[in-house]
UniProtKB/Swiss-Prot annotation:
SUPFAM superfamilies linked: PUA domain-like, S-adenosyl-L-methionine-dependent methyltransferases
Record function comment: Specifically methylates the cytosine at position 1962 (m5C1962) of 23S rRNA.
PANTHER family, A to Z: RIBOSOMAL RNA LARGE SUBUNIT METHYLTRANSFERASE (PTHR42873), S-ADENOSYLMETHIONINE-DEPENDENT METHYLTRANSFERASE DOMAIN-CONTAINING PROTEIN (PTHR42873:SF1)
Name of the gene: rlmI
Localization, UniProt: Cytoplasm
Enzyme class: transferase
Native species: Salmonella newport (strain SL254)
SMART domains: PUA
Name used for this protein in its record: Ribosomal RNA large subunit methyltransferase I
Length: 403
């Protein structure tokens, strides 16, 4: 494409000295860095981003109501944002997932991990021949048709289902959407395979895209700690950790969640894998309340898995989230037998690994127990973190030996 035929995009001009993050290829432009917009741009429309002297820096998507005013599509001036662009990004991402799928025997994985795969605001999970799409930013929504066209080119045999029913869309003035895009409707429960387990996924009604693929490696790691042990699985959802614990030879696993639907699927997952259902207990309750009740009754466990939902959405909630993480980990530590193992996680992007480790240390002090950190976890390898976007590392966890 020549200069004369290249699309002319509106220009987002940065204030003086506010281009440094873009020069380091960070994919976000915050509102405080913006001087003005030259030309008119609709919500999500493609814009060029320039410094205060007009020097071209990047090409991105405009979002006037968001604190993140622009998300970068490309740092290559010669690259237009069109179907061919999305096709290239998809094929580049698929190369890594092909290797992983072959190596680990996967039929399900995260195909696109947003900014880390060069597609900010785009999440795509693959479950067998179903592609589950989440468009979380104005730019991603604006490019919906181009992205779907690229998906159909790259995956002609796959059905596409939209799960853009995520509250974060409201922050950029978008409605929530859900439903089939192309191809057949997913079944009520779709079986997938993970590290020797068969698991049922509720694409249409489950959390996020239906299943937490990011915890795949952590679920496998659980098996080394659970042989002949009594296990408490908190925030169990559909029982991935419970099935893995049973496959690891645990004596008993108690799964706790507030959702009866999730617990019912967890029970089905145990049965699907032909595991001993008598070793699995399913409790519908609030985890905080139940842990306190267990403490009062003198209940003890050998392994506790603590995988709560995100406690913090923005910086103003961080202090409260820290208290929540400390309280729940303190309760777990108090319920463990000497030498017991705590597998604890945080999926809050604003919670750094260092801060999370400090919270666990503080929880141990409050519980009156010594704790050794023996293993560290992060999101599975199909959720990569590009070096210029450290915020992409959102999931962190620790295996702790409680003395």
């Amino acid at each position: 494409m020549t200069e004369s035929t290249f699309p002319q995009y509106p220009r987002l001009v940065l204030s003086k000295g506010r281009e440094k993050s873009l020069l380091r290829r960070h994919p976000w432009v915050f509102s405080g860095a913006v001087s003005r917009l030259e030309g008119k741009a609709n919500l999500g429309e493609t814009i060029d981003i320039v410094d205060h002297q007009g020097k071209w820096l990047a090409r991105g998507a405009w979002s006037p109501a968001s604190q993140i005013r622009a998300r970068v599509w490309t740092f290559d001036k010669a690259e237009s944002i069109d179907i061919a662009f999305f096709t290239r990004r998809l094929r580049q991402a698929q190369q890594w997932r092909d290797w992983l799928a072959k190596k680990d025997g996967l039929d399900s994985y995260r195909l696109i991990a947003g900014e880390s795969d060069g597609l900010p605001g785009v999440t795509i999970d693959r479950f067998g021949h179903f592609l589950v799409l989440q468009l979380l930013s104005a730019g991603a929504e604006y490019q919906r048709a181009a992205l779907i066209s690229a998906l159909q080119t790259c995956y002609p045999d796959c059905a596409i289902y939209d799960r853009s029913d995520v509250a974060v869309r409201k922050k950029e003035g978008m409605a929530l959407t859900q439903g089939p895009v192309t191809g057949e409707l997913p079944p009520a429960l779709l079986p997938i395979e993970e590290h020797g387990m068969k698991l049922l996924v509720d694409i249409q009604g489950g959390h996020k895209t239906g299943y937490y693929l990011d915890q795949r490696d952590s679920r496998l790691a659980t098996r080394r700690y659970v042989e002949n042990q009594r296990v408490l699985n908190c925030f169990s959802y559909t029982g991935g950790f419970a099935v893995s614990a049973l496959m690891g030879g645990c004596r008993q696993v108690v799964s706790v969640d507030t959702s009866q639907d999730a617990l019912d699927i967890a029970r089905q997952n145990v049965e699907l894998n032909q595991l001993d259902l008598s070793k699995a207990e399913f409790v519908r309750d609030d985890v905080f309340k139940l842990l306190r009740a267990y403490r009062e009754r003198g209940e003890k466990f050998d392994v506790i898995i603590m995988d709560p939902p995100k406690f913090v959405e923005n910086k103003s909630q961080l202090m409260g989230a820290c208290r929540g993480y400390k309280d729940i980990n303190m309760l777990a530590i108090q319920l463990l037998n000497p030498g017991g193992i705590l597998l604890t996680f945080s999926c809050s992007g604003l919670m750094t690994s260092d801060l999370f480790q400090k919270i666990i240390a503080d929880a141990a002090i409050d519980a009156g127990r010594d704790v050794q950190f023996i293993e560290q976890f992060r999101q599975a390898a199909d959720h990569p973190v590009i070096a210029t976007y450290p915020e992409g590392l959102y999931l962190k966890g620790f295996a702790c030996r409680v003395m």
